[in-house]
Amino acid sequence: MLSNLFVIYLLFILIPNVLNLGFGSYEITKKGSIGWFYTANEVGAIISILMPFYLNEIINKKNKPIIFLSIIIIFYTLTTMGTKGPLLSFGIILIYYFIKYYKKIIKEKKYKTLGIMTTSFIIVILALMMIIPKTTFYKNIIIHLDFLKVEKISDFKNPKIIDHFIFSQRLTFLNNTVKIYNKSPISSKLLGVGYIDNYGTDQVSMKMIEMDYFDILFRQGIIGIVIIFGGIVMTINKKKRTKKINDVYLLSLFLSIILALLTGHVITSPSVSIYVALIIDLIYNGNIKEIENDKTRVCNC
């Protein structure tokens, strides 16, 4: 089920992009297309969260041509989007499976397979070094660096450059929101300051930090963050007491947690959080057989 959803989302990005019918990922300056979707952050997060289930399924089939072709199509689609989140998730997933198989091969002393795998890994890295500079993703990095007038590595010693380039000014918005939160009464600290800053003035702002943990803490208060994240903490504790849950679910949840911090629009966006909630429910209640019956196989290697 979840792997099929991933394919649907991917096709609704890939096909419009190939036909040049997709919507732009950015309004100005940067390039990229998100197909027939509306916002890059949300669809990027959905793709990232569902990706482990699809990759897990094709790797489990052990059909090398299908694995190779799928990875190429996914990589191409993600680079045409021009955003960082999905590519970061893609890299984390591949590294996870590489390490997993690497440890298995060493344990089984299959040194010939180990040599082939290592050689293939080196070839892939070299190929990526040649391909990535030609992608939309890389061009966006250059556009961003030119905008910031970054000419050498030492320029990144400037915290403002780091904030703008890596966090897209999220740290600046975080600092501004902290000031508002600190000035608020106890009731606002408990229940949140809401989603409108400077209400009733000429400087009204609805700009969020886009780092979900901080947005929830400041906008919905201490009570809000305890209620929302209490379920995730319970899920992690449940995992410690059982070995029935496959790692692919935890990998997807891990990506959700990382993206919620780095890019936002995961827990605070209903279109994304519905998938996070589904995965948490499957982990917490152990309803793995329901997914297996929908032909989403788990990797038992």
Sequence positions of predicted segments:
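Transmembrane alpha-helices of multi-pass inner-membrane enzymes
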Residues: 249-260, 267-301
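Hydrophobic transmembrane alpha-helices and their immediate junctions
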Residues: 63-66, 99-106, 111-112, 219-258, ...
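Long extracytoplasmic/lumenal interhelical loops at the membrane interface
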Residues: 23, 27, 34, 161-220
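A membrane-periplasm/extracellular boundary helix in multi-pass inner-membrane enzymes
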Residues: 101-158, 181-183
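Alpha-helical transmembrane segments of multi-pass inner-membrane proteins
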Residues: 2-25, 38-103
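Aromatic-anchored segments of alpha-helical transmembrane domains
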Residues: 9-16, 73-79, 123-128, 254-263
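Membrane-interface micro-motifs in multi-pass membrane enzymes
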Residues: 33-48, 209-212, 217-224, 265-272
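Membrane-embedded alpha-helical segments of multi-pass membrane proteins
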Residues: 41-51, 88-92, 223-230, 271-279
